[in-house]
Amino acid sequence: MRSSAKQEELVRAFKALLKEEKFSSQGEIVLALQDQGFENINQSKVSRMLTKFGAVRTRNAKMEMVYCLPAELGVPTTSSPLKNLVLDIDYNDAVVVIHTSPGAAQLIARLLDSLGKAEGILGTIAGDDTIFTTPASGFSVRDLYEAILELFEQEL
């Protein structure tokens, strides 16, 4: 079990490094992981991880060739700037309505759907800039509203 937890920690660190889009070689990734305490990491293991997660080399904003994860595999999280795309959250007796920046609703809805029923979300319907979210059994609309506010760190 301990090695499984260590492996999950390695995968999280590896993905976080690739999201920084600043590593141009496998050797740089090895050194960065070693700096984070993963002493048994080597170039061949990094190479296998790059293949496993579908990492590609592409140009970053500075036009440098760097390793990164494909967009679909880089699962969005609420600690990323996604929360900045949420403009307003409100509710009525039936649904929670979330207004987003134009074009962002489907991305935010995907994140909410990934949380699932255990977090109180039965499902979402997303347009271009609006999301309808309905609570799962055992959750009130108000409970879901408060959970979504907390998720996106919005004020009541």
From Swiss-Prot:
One of its GO terms (biological process) is L-arginine biosynthetic process. GO terms for cellular component: cytoplasm; transcription regulator complex. Signal peptide: none annotated. One of its GO terms (molecular function) is arginine binding. Disulfide bonds: none annotated. Its main location: cytoplasm. PANTHER family: ARGININE REPRESSOR (PTHR34471:SF1). Homohexamer. Belongs to the ArgR family. Negatively controls the expression of the four operons of arginine biosynthesis in addition to the carAB operon. Predominantly interacts with A/T residues in ARG boxes. This is Arginine repressor. The lineage of its organism: Bacteria, Pseudomonadati, Pseudomonadota, Gammaproteobacteria, Enterobacterales.
